[in-house]
């Protein structure tokens, strides 16, 4: 199901494929801090036109743990992009040197263009404001590892649900499971209508809320996203929203004992740092699971049948 496939959007993947990915990632956990030769001789090219810490490092670590090598760049500085080379030509060059390409770009559709140009499989490491499929896969994998299942859970998404690219992909991923999804944000920061229409058509159960306190007692998972300055064209709008939705120890007094708090990171002040040492904090575990999850993804795409 996975061999040779591009990973551009979550809409291309169903429940069966995700469950196969999760089982493979669980197997890969034992190799996440060692090195095996599953992909010896394979090369991954990374083309990160936007800043990244966790996504880039976890992809690079994953490939090296699998026995492969990594080439590429992080920012356009010092590359032919600075000289005016087109995205398509850059991808063609990387395609000639590698077996798989990971791209991050500020423009929506950049990963799709790369996939159309390249013969090698292309993985979207985040493009535009609406797609980050491997983060959504990681988010679901963390939930699956934490609870042993996804069906039947009440999952809250809180913060900037319009401009956070992780939210769009996560909603599309959740549409493969029987969950209740609580969208907690100001009305003007709800997910875009096109995404909501799609997940509703898939049967995802949604409710809208402006205050986390009114639903915190119902949630099994609370997924928090920061207000992203770089996604706002109007700095006044950013200042107005920043810090509006924050998780504190006081709020958690009403939460279920097993509530898992997730965050794609980096955080600013939307999660009180005093929560880091509570059983609710799963965001650092979530980040750590990025390596075995991406090991599994790369392995499934590149491995022989």
Swiss-Prot record:
Chain residues that bind carbamoyl phosphate: 54-55, 104, 132, 135, 265-266
Keywords: Pyrimidine biosynthesis, Transferase
Binding, L-aspartate: 83, 165, 226
Record PROSITE patterns: CARBAMOYLTRANSFERASE
InterPro entries: Asp/Orn_carbamoyltranf_P-bd, Asp/Orn_carbamoylTrfase, Asp/Orn_carbamoylTrfase_sf, Asp_carbamoyltransf, Asp_carbamoyltransf_Asp/Orn-bd
GO molecular function: amino acid binding; aspartate carbamoyltransferase activity
A GO BP entry: 'de novo' pyrimidine nucleobase biosynthetic process
Reactions catalysed according to its record: carbamoyl phosphate + L-aspartate = N-carbamoyl-L-aspartate + phosphate + H(+)
Pathway: Pyrimidine metabolism; UMP biosynthesis via de novo pathway; (S)-dihydroorotate from bicarbonate: step 2/3
Gene3D superfamilies: Aspartate/ornithine carbamoyltransferase
EC number: 2.1.3.2
Binding partners and assembly: Heterooligomer of catalytic and regulatory chains.
Function: Catalyzes the condensation of carbamoyl phosphate and aspartate to form carbamoyl aspartate and inorganic phosphate, the committed step in the de novo pyrimidine nucleotide biosynthesis pathway.
UniProt record similarity statement: Belongs to the aspartate/ornithine carbamoyltransferase superfamily. ATCase family.
Name by which UniProt lists this protein: Aspartate carbamoyltransferase catalytic subunit
Organism, scientific name: Pyrobaculum arsenaticum (strain DSM 13514 / JCM 11321 / PZ6)
Gene from which this protein is expressed: pyrB
